[in-house]
């Protein structure tokens, strides 16, 4: 909508007012992890290690490429989008282990 002109006729007729910009809704934050949640998850990952299917994914990525790993991850996780994210996470773990 265009800015009002302050005159009574024309396409943009009406009183000039400053438009209110409401704060974003709290519900828009759904799915974004808080700092505490990130910390707790990293701590659990450090203590508990990888689950068996994650170890298998890493093995598949190293040996037979990502396509097979994605298929296994999709079977385990249910959706292809989550499978791609998990394979990407496992790639990051492999890269981190190479660095150290």
From Swiss-Prot:
Keywords (A to Z) from UniProt: Cytoplasm, Ribonucleoprotein, Ribosomal protein
Matching InterPro entries: Ribosomal_eL36 (IPR000509), Ribosomal_eL36_sf (IPR038097)
One GO MF term attached to the UniProt entry: RNA binding
One GO CC term on file: cytosolic large ribosomal subunit
Location(s) in or outside the cell: Cytoplasm
UniProt keyword Ligase, yes or no: no
Record field: transmembrane: none
Record Gene3D superfamilies: 60S ribosomal protein L36
Superkingdom classification of source: Eukaryota
One record GO biological process: cytoplasmic translation
Function, as annotated: Component of the ribosome, a large ribonucleoprotein complex responsible for the synthesis of proteins in the cell. The small ribosomal subunit (SSU) binds messenger RNAs (mRNAs) and translates the encoded message by selecting cognate aminoacyl-transfer RNA (tRNA) molecules. The large subunit (LSU) contains the ribosomal catalytic site termed the peptidyl transferase center (PTC), which catalyzes the formation of peptide bonds, thereby polymerizing the amino acids delivered by tRNAs into a polypeptide chain.
Protein family (similarity comment): Belongs to the eukaryotic ribosomal protein eL36 family.
Self-association and partners: Component of the large ribosomal subunit (LSU). Mature yeast ribosomes consist of a small (40S) and a large (60S) subunit. The 40S small subunit contains 1 molecule of ribosomal RNA (18S rRNA) and 33 different proteins (encoded by 57 genes). The large 60S subunit contains 3 rRNA molecules (25S, 5.8S and 5S rRNA) and 46 different proteins (encoded by 81 genes).
Additional remarks: Present with 5370 molecules/cell in log phase SD medium.
UniProt xrefs under PANTHER family: 60S RIBOSOMAL PROTEIN L36 (PTHR10114)
Protein name, per record: Large ribosomal subunit protein eL36B
């Amino acid at each position: 909508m265009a800015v009002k002109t302050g005159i009574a006729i024309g396409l943009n007729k009406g009183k000039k007012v400053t438009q209110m910009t409401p704060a974003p809704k709290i519900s828009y934050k759904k799915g974004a992890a808080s700092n505490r949640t990130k910390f707790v998850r990293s701590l659990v990952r450090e203590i508990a290690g990888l689950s068996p299917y994650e170890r298998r994914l890493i093995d598949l990525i190293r040996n037979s490429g990502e396509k097979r790993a994605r298929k296994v991850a999709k079977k385990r996780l249910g959706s292809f989008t989550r499978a791609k994210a998990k394979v990407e996470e496992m790639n990051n773990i492999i890269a981190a282990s190479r660095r150290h």
